């Protein structure tokens, strides 16, 4: 429990969003476990790392043989490999499931990528598919990925591709702003127009919205956001694992490094004084250059996804996972951050 933050969270939820719904809340873990029909299906959504192991240690003595634990956090796939073996050695089943969608996904359906103990799939399939997002053709964005930590490996690569997409959008924004001198509204119009064609995606859509958003003072919020990006680790893991598998992941690696560079604000500020960005000649045909930026962004996106899926294939071969790459692409068509017509 986080002091001052999580006390009373169950009560607030029951009196808020859950009010009038068939939802029970518990503050005692034993009472919670005892309330669930056997075989129990318990989904853990906690911070990756030791908190998952600590929660599992609390749950193990309370479970019955055949019960299923689902880790829906951003766990490292190697941790999931270990947890699958540990749970199965105790007579339980373990599912390591990538989940993408953020707060909106929690409310309206996420992209869910389960892997681990395959015997658990028939039990958890109706539950996970019922809360998953639906693709445009109505297919649930949730299918079985494979054994061991494959589900979390797929989510890791998803996040790496997400890093790449965001970096490409940031660079397109920078060129339009610094080289073409487009206003926020003009750039918003460009991104909105792109979102009507083959670049239509969640990230392009929200970029247009962000560029138009104004704060309470009436100024554009984008101009007041610190240009320093953090990261939680999955992008870095993608690059490390690609290197260990001997696969190129250059675009995503650069996106990870750019995030690291962005956090060095003082150094960048000093460098910006020494190396001024100046126009050498006026830009006459801005519309033509915007078309070129579109083409460059689309081509770069192709490279990013091709590299990401190549890493998935190499991991599948190396670990004997037998991943269905087409099924994975279909799972990413809705709910997740990289959902797009591209997929």
Give a label for each model feature:
Residues 176-188, 242-247, 318-321:
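Inter-helical turn/loop segments and adjacent helix faces that build the functional surface
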Residues 1-8:
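Glycine-rich phosphate/diphosphate-binding loop of Rossmann-like nucleotide-binding domains
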Residues 186-191, 252-257, 324-329:
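Beta-strand segments within the central parallel beta-sheet cores of soluble alpha/beta enzyme folds
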Residues 193, 316-343:
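Small-residue-rich helix-loop
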Residues 52-56, 76-189, 197-224, 258-288:
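Rossmann-fold dinucleotide-binding core
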Residues 222-304:
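A conserved active-site cap/scaffold subdomain adjacent to cofactor or substrate pockets
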Residues 5, 14-92, 102-118:
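Rossmann-like NAD(P)-binding element
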């Amino acid at each position: 429990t986080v002091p001052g933050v999580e006390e009373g969270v169950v009560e607030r939820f029951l009196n808020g969003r859950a009010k009038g719904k068939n939802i029970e809340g518990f503050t005692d873990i034993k009472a919670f476990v005892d309330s669930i029909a056997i075989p129990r299906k318990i989904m853990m959504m906690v911070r990756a790392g030791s908190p998952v192991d600590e929660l599992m240690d609390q749950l193990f003595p309370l479970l019955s043989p055949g019960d299923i634990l689902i880790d829906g956090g951003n766990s490292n796939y190697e941790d999931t490999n270990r947890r699958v073996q540990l749970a199965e050695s105790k007579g339980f089943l373990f599912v390591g499931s990538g989940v993408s969608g953020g707060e909106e996904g929690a409310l309206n359906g996420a992209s869910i990528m389960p892997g681990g103990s395959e015997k658990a799939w028939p039990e958890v399939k109706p539950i996970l598919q019922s809360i998953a997002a639906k693709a445009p053709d109505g297919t649930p964005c949730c299918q079985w990925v494979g054994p061991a930590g494959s589900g979390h490996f797929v989510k890791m690569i998803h996040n790496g591709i997400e890093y790449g997409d965001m970096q490409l959008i940031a660079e397109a924004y920078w060129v339009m702003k610094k080289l073409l001198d487009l206003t926020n509204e003009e750039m918003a119009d460009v991104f909105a127009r792109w979102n009507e064609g083959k670049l239509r995606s969640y990230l392009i859509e929200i970029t247009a919205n962000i560029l138009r958003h104004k704060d309470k003072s009436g100024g554009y919020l984008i101009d007041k956001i610190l240009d320093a990006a953090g990261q939680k680790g999955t992008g870095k893991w993608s690059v490390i694992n690609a290197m260990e598998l001997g696969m190129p992941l250059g675009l995503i690696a650069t996106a990870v490094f750019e995030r690291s560079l962005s956090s060095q604000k003082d150094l960048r500020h000093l460098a910006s004084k020494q190396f001024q960005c100046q126009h050498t000649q006026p830009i006459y045909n801005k519309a033509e250059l915007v078309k070129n930026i579109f083409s460059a962004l689309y081509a770069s996106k192709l490279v990013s996804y091709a590299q990401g899926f190549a890493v998935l294939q190499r991991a599948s071969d190396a670990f004997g996972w037998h991943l269905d790459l087409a099924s994975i692409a279909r799972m990413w068509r809705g709910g997740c951050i990289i959902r797009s017509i591209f997929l």
